[in-house]
C-alpha cells in the first residue's frame, strides 16, 4: 500500500501478485476481493494488466467526497473475466454492487459470462439494494450471453444483461447513478435487454455510451412490476433521469435468427426503450440499424410511460418504425401519457415491413406486405402526448409518415413537423387505421394544423448508407419551429449547440 495523503491510499492488484503481500505497487495483491476487504473511503484500487477470474463483490462504501475507486492501471487493461466461473440463476453477475454507496469503476473490461440454461441470467454488472452514488466510466462490457437455443415446455426463454440495475427497496431507491463513456456489445440477452434500469431507481444519467451488436433491446428504462413484482407500485419504476449522447446501433433480432425466428416478437428490438417509467429525458442520441429506433410504450397493467421527453435525436435506417408510442395492439392495460416527441430528425426508417400479417391481431391489420409501421407509430391508448418540430423524411417505397393504428387514445397534439419524401408513393399518413394521401385530409382528421408537407428540409446528405442529417444553411427548417417551454425544448441541440437562437428554434434535431 502506498499512502496518498492522510485520508486515502492506493492499492495494487496483479495476476502475478499474492494476497499475503501488502498491496503496494511493488508487492501487489493477487485478487480484487483481497483489495476490497482493505479499502477505506477515498482509496483507489489499481488493477494491473491481465484477466481476473473472480466475482467482484464490494463490501465497503465510500463517503461524500471520498469515493472508493476500482480501475485499470493507467495505460493497461484489466479484465473481469467470467470464462471459468460458475454462472447460474439471477444476480450472479461478474460485478455485484449491493447496498454500496460512493463507489466508481473505471476503464475495466467486464466480459465472458455464459450459460445455456433457461431461467439463468448471465450478467456483467448488477446494481441493486439501496446502492447510491455509483459510477461506471470508460468500461467495456461484452460477450455476456445466454445461448439457450429453444423455448422449453414452461415457456421460459433465455435471458442475460450486460448491465442490470434493479431497485428493490421501497424506502430507499438506487440513486445518483452515472454510466458514461462505456461500450456494450456482443450480448445475447434473449427476451431481456442489454442494459436495464428498472424498479425504484431515481436521478440517473446514462450518457456518451455506445451500445451495439446486441440481439434485443439496447437500453430500457422501465417499471419494476416484472422483475420486482412485490414492490410498492408508487415507487417501483425508474424516474427522474436522462439518456443522452449515446450511440445505439444494430440492436436487432437479425443477430440471432436461429433463436428469434421462433418468437412472435421477431423483429421488434428497440434501440432505446421507455417502458412503464416516468420523467425521463432521451436526448442527443444517434439510433440506427435497430429493429426499431426509440420506444415510449408500456407492457404493464400497473405503470404508464409518463411525463417523458424524446428530443434532439437522429433516428435513421432502422428496420421498422423510427419512434414507437403506445401499447401493443389489443393490450388493455396502460400506455403512453403526457410525453413529448419534439425536435427529432427521422430519416429512412421502415426498411422492412411490420410484424402484423393480418392474422396475428384483432384488427386484422397487415403492415408487413408492401406496408410499414410508419416513421412515427402510435398504437393503443396514447393520451395527451405531443409530436412536434420533427423532420420526418421518408424514403423507402413502403414508408408512411405517421401511422396511428386504432381509434383508442385521446388529446394527442401533432404540429410543426416537416413531412418530406422524394418518392410520391409514400406521401401518406394513417389515422385511426385509415390511410390518407391528401395533406389537407390528414390535417382535418389529426388536428395537425401547423406542419408543412412536401418541403425539402435540405439535409446535408441523404446518401442512404451514411446520411448527414444536419441542415444546410438554406434549409426551410431553420428558425421555423414551434416554441415550447424551456423544460420541453431543452438547452442544446443534437450536437450540444445552443437550442433557442434569438427566440427562434429550428425544426429537427440540428439547430
PLM region spans:
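Acidic glycine-/aspartate-rich tracts in secreted/extracellular proteins
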Residues: 16-20, 50-52, 74-76, 351, ...
Amino acid at each position: 500500500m502506498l499512502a496518498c495523503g492522510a485520508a486515502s491510499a492506493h492499492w495494487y492488484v496483479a495476476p502475478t501478485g499474492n494476497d499475503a503481500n501488502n498491496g503496494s505497487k511493488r508487492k501487489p495483491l493477487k485478487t480484487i476481493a483481497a483489495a476490497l476487504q482493505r479499502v477505506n473511503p477515498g482509496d483507489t484500487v489499481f488493477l494491473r494488466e491481465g484477466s481476473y477470474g473472480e466475482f467482484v463483490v464490494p463490501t465497503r462504501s465510500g463517503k461524500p467526497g471520498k469515493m472508493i475507486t476500482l480501475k485499470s492501471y493507467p495505460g493497461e487493461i484489466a479484465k473481469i473475466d467470467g470464462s471459468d466461473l460458475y454462472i447460474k440463476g439471477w444476480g450472479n453477475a461478474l460485478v455485484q454492487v449491493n447496498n454500496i454507496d460512493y463507489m466508481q469503476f473505471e476503464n475495466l473490461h467486464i466480459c465472458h459470462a455464459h450459460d445455456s440454461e433457461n431461467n439463468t441470467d448471465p450478467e456483467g454488472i448488477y446494481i441493486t439494494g439501496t446502492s447510491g452514488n455509483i459510477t461506471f466510466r470508460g468500461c467495456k462490457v461484452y460477450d455476456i450471453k445466454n445461448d439457450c437455443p429453444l423455448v422449453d415446455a414452461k415457456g421460459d426463454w433465455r435471458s442475460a444483461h450486460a448491465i442490470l440495475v434493479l431497485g428493490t427497496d421501497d424506502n430507499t431507491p438506487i440513486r445518483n447513478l452515472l454510466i458514461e463513456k462505456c461500450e456494450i456489445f456482443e450480448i445475447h440477452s434473449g427476451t431481456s435487454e442489454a442494459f436495464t434500469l428498472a424498479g425504484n431507481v431515481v436521478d440517473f444519467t446514462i450518457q456518451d455510451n455506445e451500445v451495439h451488436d446486441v440481439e434485443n433491446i439496447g437500453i430500457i428504462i422501465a417499471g419494476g412490476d416484472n422483475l420486482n413484482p412485490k414492490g410498492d407500485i408508487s415507487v417501483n419504476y425508474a424516474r427522474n433521469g436522462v439518456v443522452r449522447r449515446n450511440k445505439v446501433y444494430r440492436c436487432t433480432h437479425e443477430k440471432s435468427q436461429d433463436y428469434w425466428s421462433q418468437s412472435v416478437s421477431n423483429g421488434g428490438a428497440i434501440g432505446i426503450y421507455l417502458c412503464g417509467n416516468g420523467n425521463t429525458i432521451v436526448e442527443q442520441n444517434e439510433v440506427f440499424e435497430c429493429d426499431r429506433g426509440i420506444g415510449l410504450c408500456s407492457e404493464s397493467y400497473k405503470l404508464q410511460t409518463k411525463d417523458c421527453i424524446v428530443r434532439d435525436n437522429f433516428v435513421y435506417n432502422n428496420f421498422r418504425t423510427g419512434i414507437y408510442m403506445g401499447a401493443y395492439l389489443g393490450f388493455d392495460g396502460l400506455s403512453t401519457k403526457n410525453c413529448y416527441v419534439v425536435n427529432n430528425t427521422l430519416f429512412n426508417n421502415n426498411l422492412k415491413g411490420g410484424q402484423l400479417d393480418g392474422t396475428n391481431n384483432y384488427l386484422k391489420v397487415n403492415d408487413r406486405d408492401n406496408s410499414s409501421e410508419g416513421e412515427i407509430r402510435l398504437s393503443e391508448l396514447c393520451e395527451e402526448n405531443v409530436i412536434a418540430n420533427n423532420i420526418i423524411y421518408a424514403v423507402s417505397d413502403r414508408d408512411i409518415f405517421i401511422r396511428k393504428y386504432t381509434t383508442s387514445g385521446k388529446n394527442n397534439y401533432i404540429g410543426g413537423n416537416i413531412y418530406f419524401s422524394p418518392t410520391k408513393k409514400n406521401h401518406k399518413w394513417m389515422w385511426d387505421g385509415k390511410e390518407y394521401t391528401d395533406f389537407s385530409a390528414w390535417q382535418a382528421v389529426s388536428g395537425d394544423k401547423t406542419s408543412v408537407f412536401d418541403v425539402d428540409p435540405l439535409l446535408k446528405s441523404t446518401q442512404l448508407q451514411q446520411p448527414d442529417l444536419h441542415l444546410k444553411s438554406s434549409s426551410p427548417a431553420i428558425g421555423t419551429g414551434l416554441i415550447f417551454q424551456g423544460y420541453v425544448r431543452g438547452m442544446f441541440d443534437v450536437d450540444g449547440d445552443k437550442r433557442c437562437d434569438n427566440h427562434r428554434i429550428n425544426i429537427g434535431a440540428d439547430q
